[in-house]
Amino acid sequence: MARIAGINIPPHQHAEIGLTAIFGIGRTRARKICEACGIAYSKKIKDLTDGDLEKIRDQIAQFTIEGDLRRETTMNIKRLMDIGCYRGFRHRRGLPMRGQRTRTNARTRKGPRKGAAALKK
């Protein structure tokens, strides 16, 4: 099993799909990495040589991925909340921040419905 950026890549998957197991790498970026390394998208992870895996690691090192990306995203949201802007306020309240209606819908962001008894108290 290949290990890239601290993630075990499933060996039975194609290179393009297997690389998407890494947080921060989607299909488009995976294709660009494969192109830069000269690897066919359809080549299975288990068929890659150690040299191929090393090339992939070098390419991936150029991007912000996994823990660093998660930390950066969290810090960006925290910054919005600290400066007190509208988007930060919506994040703090757990509401949608891109203008969607909230009188009805927005259940994913707001969580499960509160019963009528809970509202009357």
Curated annotation (Swiss-Prot):
Source species: Paracidovorax citrulli (strain AAC00-1) (Acidovorax citrulli)
GO molecular function: rRNA binding; structural constituent of ribosome; tRNA binding
GO BP, one annotated term: translation
Role according to the record: Located at the top of the head of the 30S subunit, it contacts several helices of the 16S rRNA. In the 70S ribosome it contacts the 23S rRNA (bridge B1a) and protein L5 of the 50S subunit (bridge B1b), connecting the 2 subunits; these bridges are implicated in subunit movement. Contacts the tRNAs in the A and P-sites.
Subunit structure: Part of the 30S ribosomal subunit. Forms a loose heterodimer with protein S19. Forms two bridges to the 50S subunit in the 70S ribosome.
Keywords, ordered alphabetically: Ribonucleoprotein, Ribosomal protein, RNA-binding, rRNA-binding, tRNA-binding
Protein name: Small ribosomal subunit protein uS13
GO cellular component: cytosol; small ribosomal subunit
Superkingdom, taxonomy of origin: Bacteria
Gene: rpsM
Region (Disordered): 93-121
Similarity field: Belongs to the universal ribosomal protein uS13 family.
InterPro entries according to UniProt: Rbsml_uS13_C, Ribosomal_uS13, Ribosomal_uS13-like_H2TH, Ribosomal_uS13_bac-type, Ribosomal_uS13_CS
SUPFAM superfamilies per record: S13-like H2TH domain
